Structures are given as structure tokens and as C-alpha cells.
């Protein structure tokens, strides 16, 4: 296929906008002949060719009109059938229609007065515009045909990596279709401007690489390093994961000379990476100090761990001090991870704020024709782009989300290559500020840049947690509020305006991201609470803050400065911080104590990407920004109904488990705790099949299944300990049988967790199906839930058996403690509301005076009965 592709590439000459297929060339030839015949005159002198009889001008004009109408009809049909380039084709058809009408009027006027040079010039310009519009329509139609063929070829590919490459190549062709036209047109119109050639060559190279990628993926000949150039989790995250695995050693085979240098070398490599992040310009001083402190703590924990290994050398079992040292080591590496994530989020929060400002400033300078300013702002724009790429790579370095890291790196590569071309488009516009072609070229590159920045932002958001984002945003807004107050007191209008704009941008980003996050959950008390906090911030707090900023700037800008209420501004600023803090508190409401660490951060190791948006590369619609969960939500109604039936059956089983665990106090009873955890995770997995819940991608579901398997293993260990102490053989056998069911159903759930909606393109229509995989997942979860219920009951029965036999000695040291859950406490006396106590006045009853003798006599009388 490669040999067949090369001649096509060589025949495609962007200078003349020559199309790439003979079929389209034959379609264009009649119109070119008719138009050129109409506009040609004898100005070039007498011809040596044999004279003949030319058609009348009116006849040629009608022929041009008919040919144009034919293109319009075909173009409208192609636009109607196209899925990928519908909007571009519709715009191209309308352009041909407009230029055709202009040509019809101009040719008619010229035919009536063929001696008029003015009318002839008007017609020549109209003819050129018509040919340009028709050529663009044919290029787009050709591209649509190529993409349609590629879609069918992509379905036939078996290797997922090849399908991904094919999808990426299709996306590149679609992206570069319009850019190819505008860049080539700008180069043709302004060949003396060097930047136009750079733009044209860049787009042409992108198309060449896309076609080469199609050839490679179709033949599965992509080089290994090219296939996996962006694959793998972050380097720092991988090093930390490997270090955590390496610290688990067997004391029996431990050798200090062998293991100490290796572990210390690995740790120093990790600390070097952490130090680079700490020394970065966007890292706050307090964050830098925390990272340094955590690095020192990890060093010390490693030395303590190695000392314990030396003390336990030659032993078969690990002692409690050694286990404690391992736990401490793991905790310290986890703390270091948290600080590194926070440092990365510092960078993201600062760099991905108002990402379009450098571009807009560059374009405004280009429109004014000031090439010197354009070069100055181009440097600022280049630094901004480099910062985005740098921060994106930092985010990748600490992420465990392999799929997300791949997408971020691909998006960052696109940003890096597109940046110089945006500058070239601006230089072209600065050199020819009155040129509509240069302006159109700038607009296309501007749109492409903004789209790529959005993709990069969403991809970076996808590998960071919402909780880290909220924590850092809260701190940054507090910093900016303090800066605003200081600038206000010092009368620094520029700093006040700039910092207030940053506060508005941060608050708007919080609102946008948390609104998107709440779409992952079913409506309920939790989502209502969060959405109320968001509404309060966006509709009440921020308008008041903006109003106070405007008043303050207006008062300080006058000469002399006018007095104003400083306290009003401070109160409005404080409310912004309080509003973001309230949103964070509302989001953290459903976190478990294990998830809420020292600074209320959600420690997310397996779920490193439970967040806003997801961009997949498995299907074209996923590239457009839809997650696997969103695709599940697009299943046909018949499949949704069947899934709903399965979910209802699962809920009935869940209610049984809820009723069982609700009876017991989970303090000292890890079996109940594990049952609750497994129930919660299984509920999230079933929600995924309906396009709901926090799980977004197949990797999230797989990680959830792993968590359930881990919980099942821990429950198996506890329940077997209960069974070992049970003297009743029947109860013991029942409990062990239920444990075998848990192991089986955990394995089934792990297999079914690969649930994924299948998307097929049949006849240009996307067909989404996923009933079998979804129902299998729900059924496996239902079976596991039933096994957990039976295990909890059997564990309690077995515990009662061995307590009866062994007496109080067993009761005092059980494997788990079975205590009935205490009822909720209720006040014995109804408490009055404070406002009622203040307003209600009651008349006290008259106090009765009873003599002691009378009371004693009554007491004796009652005693006599």
C-alpha cells in the first residue's frame, strides 16, 4: 500500500490546489474549460492555430451556470451523507452558490457588452473566485470520501493499536482539511511572505504523515518505538510504585550488602525527581518546604526499615516492629505522592488559567500591522505554549493512569508543533493586515489552537483528582484575595485588576469542573447540596465581588483617588473564598475516613483519574470527548430497559445486605466493614452500566473489580479464622462453602469488569450496543452480593457456636466482635427552639407546700399495700 500511496502524494501540488484523484479532476475539467473559454480574449495577439468558430458568449455563460448547478447538487448530497465534514461541506456549497450567482451576473453583463474592459475584469475576478470555491468543495468532498473509506477499513482491523492509529490518522486528516486550503491560498496570494510557505509546508507534512500512518496501521508495519512512544504511566509514579514493591523483602534471605545500595539508589532517584519539581518556578515556597520535609522523612523511614530487616535477618516470620516499619515506609511514600500531586496541581492551576489571553494579544498586534510588536508578543506566546507542555508532562510524571498519560502526551506534542505555525500565521497577517486571505488563515489557526488547548486541558484534568484540584484552588484563591486587599490598600490599580481577574477565572473553573463532576452522580441529597453551593458562588457571590472590584478600580483611577468602602470589598473577597471552601466541603461529604487524610485530601492510588472528562482513542466519537460511561448512556432504549430490570434485581439483593449489616455495630467487626465496602463498589459498577456514577472508563471498572477482589480476600481470611474456631462441623462447612462462592464470584466479576460499549459504523450510522457485557457484570455483582449476605450470616452463627462451647475465654478474644447496633439516640424531652424560648411566656404553676409528716404518712400507707 505504501508504494501505491507515494505517487498520489507526489501528484498533489498545493500551489495550484490540484486535487488528488482523477475522478475529481475529470469533474472539474468541464467547468475550467468553459470558464477559461469565456474569459479568454485575443489580447495576446494573433494565434498561429487554425481558426474556427467560437460559441456565443451567452451560450458559454449558460454552460457555466449549468456546470455550477451540477456541482451544487452533488455537493449538497455529499454534505448530507457525510458524518465527519458536514459543516465544512455545507459552508463550501454555500460559497460555491454565492460565487456562482456572482459569476452568472458578471458573465451575462459581459456577454451583453463584450467590448467593455471593466465588465471583462469583473467577470475574470468572478471566474477566479468561482474556480477557487469549486476547488475547495472538491478537496473537501475528496477528503470526505477518503475518511468514509478509512472508517470501513478501521472496522476491519483486528489489532486495537492499529485501530487507534487509524482513528488518529482520520482525526489528523479532518483537522488539516481546512488548514490545508487556507494555508495554500495564503501562500499563493502572498508568496513573498516567508511565513506563508512555513504554514503550507507544515500542513502538507501533517497530511503526509497522516496518510503514512494509515498505510502503516493498515499493514501493521508501525515501528515498535513509534507505537509505544507515548505509552506507560508517569516516570515518577512508576518509580514510586516499584520502590513500594521492592521494600517488601523476606527476612530469611535479607542481605544488607545486596539490598541496601539498591533501595537507597532507587530512593535517591525518586528524590531527585521530586527536587526538580520542588525547584520549579510555579511551586509555592510552603509546598517546596513540605516536599523537602517529606523527602527527608522518606529517607529516615528507609533507614529505620533497613535496621528492622537487619534485626530480623534469618527469621522465617516478620516481627511486629518490622511490619510497623513497612507500614510507616508505605505511609511516608504516600505522603510524598500527595505533596507531589499538590505541587503539580499548583502548576496546572496557574498555567491553565486564561489560556487564550496570549493568543488574543498576538492576533490584535498582527491585525494592526505592527511586525515588531508581533515578534515581541510571539515570544510571550511561545513561552506560554512551552509552559503548557511542561506542566502537562509534570502531570504525567506523577500519574498512574496509563491511558490518560498517553492522551496528555499526544495533546502536548500537538501543542508543541502547532505553536510556531500560529506565530507564522500572525506574521503573515502582520505583513498583509488588509488581506482577507491572511485573516482567514489566521482564524483557522486560531480555532485549531484553541481546540488543541481545550483537548490538552481536558486530558490533564482527567489524570488529576477533583479533591486535589479543589484543595489547591481554595489555597490559590486565598492567596489572590490577600494580594487584592494589599493592592487595594496600596492603591495599585494594575495589580488589583489583574489579581481580581485571576480570582474570577479560578472561581469560574471551579464551577465548570464541579458541575461536570456532578453529572457523574445520580440526583440526590449529595448532588443537590453541591449544586446549591455552586449556584450561590456563581449567581450571588461572584457578581457582588465583580461589582466591588469595579467600584474600587473606578475610585482608585480618579485623580485624586475617591474614598470608598474598603470593608465592603474585603467582605466580598472573603465571601469568594468561603464559597469555594463550601463547595469543597460539599464535595467531600461522601468521602470515607480512609479517603480523608491529614489535610482532608482524597488519597487516590488506583483511581488516579476519577474526574471531569475523558478522551479515548478507541473510537472516533471517544476522541471527540465522550467517555466509556457516556457511551453506555447512549445504548438503545430496549437495551436500557433490560439493564434496568437487571439493576432492579441487584437492588433487591443489595437491600438484603443492607438489612443484614444494619443490625451490627461495625466497631471491631471487619467482616461488616468489608461487606459495606464491597456493596458500595458494586453499586458504582452497576451504575456504570447505566451511564451513571463516578466510574468513567473501563479502566475504572477494572480497578473497582480489583478492590472488590482485595476486600473479598480479606473477608475470606477473617471468615476462615472464624470457621477454624467453630466446633460445629455443619456450620463450619456452610461457612467455607459460602467463602468458595465469594472467591468464584470475585473472579467472575473481575472478568466481567472489562465491560465496554461496542460502537459500530454501519452505513454511516453509529450503532451502540453493550447489553451482553452489561448484564453479565450486573449478574456477577448480584451473585457476589448474595454470597456476601450468606457469609455474614454464617459467620455470626459460627461465632455463637464456639462461644457457647468455649465459654467466656472465647468471648473475650473473638476474631470479630458481634454487637448489635445501638439505636439512634433521641432526646427524652423535646427541646424547644431558641426563638420559641425567647418569645413564649408561660405562667408557672403554683407551688404546693406539703408537710414532711404528711409525705411520710402517705409513703407508709403505700408500703402497707
Swiss-Prot record:
May function as a linker between cadherin adhesion receptors and the cytoskeleton to regulate cell-cell adhesion and differentiation in the nervous system. It comes from the Eukaryota. InterPro entries: Alpha-catenin/vinculin-like_sf, Alpha_catenin, Vinculin/catenin. This is Catenin alpha-2. Its main location: membrane. GO terms for molecular function: actin filament binding; beta-catenin binding; cadherin binding. It comes from Danio rerio (Zebrafish). The keyword Nucleus applies. It is found in: Cell membrane; Cytoplasm; Cytoplasm, Cytoskeleton; Cell junction, Adherens junction. Keywords: Cell adhesion, Cell junction, Cell membrane, Cell projection, Cytoplasm, Cytoskeleton, Developmental protein, Differentiation, Membrane, Nucleus. PANTHER family: ALPHA CATENIN, CATENIN ALPHA-2. One of its GO terms (biological process) is regulation of synapse structural plasticity. Residues 840-850 have a biased composition (Basic residues).
